């Protein structure tokens, strides 16, 4: 009987690890970057609820309230071109694969309000024109992580 229980527990463990493992070591991808940050062709919207709508529509608040997110209102080509700028150390980590835009871009910063609790994620919306810093990987280099605005 003990051996049977051990086998069942082992089988469940293998099944759970099969579900969890792919996301553990998963590297950021250009698809994730696009889903979380790109909003080309859309001018910055001054509606105070636009962040709430975009975060939900893009599935960014599917499992929890993300504290901060930034949407880029520029063409994919313009953002991709940032990867050809001089390489630098990222602002939010010690990674050295970041690049800073040479000009300002239209962005929308979404910041979680302090009183907000999942699943009712509530964000403040701030439209800006700032330089951005992104991490790029691959050959050719493509954006995979939004690092900061400066």
Swiss-Prot record:
Top EC category: lyase
SS bonds (residue pairs): 51-110, 65-121, 83-136, 90-98
Subcellular location: Secreted
Residues making up the signal peptide according to the UniProt record: 1-25
Origin: domain of life: Eukaryota
Function: Endonuclease that catalyzes the cleavage of RNA on the 3' side of pyrimidine nucleotides. Acts on single-stranded and double-stranded RNA.
Name this protein carries in UniProt: Ribonuclease pancreatic delta-type
